[in-house]
Amino acid sequence: MILYDPRQPHGMHEFGIQIPVMDSRASETYARLTAHPELGPRAAEWHLREVREAGRREDLLRAHSCDYVQRLFSSALEAEIVRTFELIDVHGRYHRYDPAGATLPLTAMLDRILVRVGGTIQACRTALGSGFCFYFGGGMHHAQWDFGKGFCLLNDVVIALRKLQAGLLTESGHQPN
């Protein structure tokens, strides 16, 4: 299974961030898969067309400290984004960042990132049922317990795994081996 939601943007230019993350990697890969003579006609069998959930605050608390999650849902969010994406250099100058060119505020990134976390949760849940699922929007695995790192504000992989792990514990009634 492949989770690819074409409505989900991958770039960050609308936030004024000039880090070259291109939508084309996902869209071109998807286009090549659907153009494949064997895979294309069977796209309905392997393509999940939309991310159906967003990560929630309680999901974030499975992988991040309460203090960090509170900072993300407060006026400190913009400072966390600036630090995580290294948008100001050691001399206090903008680095790969042009706020004048932004069409959206930096703080609007959180909603987009929460949808990506939800996509990773959905992909992991799908993989449990089908044996495999690749999600074009995931992989924010550098974020730490109490801070974002390496252009990753949240650790979607750990959040998803811990959410699914908690679901397994709840459903089975005992701790699995």
Task: Walk through the language-model features, giving the residues of each.
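HDAC/HDAC-like amidohydrolase catalytic core signature
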Residues: M1-N177
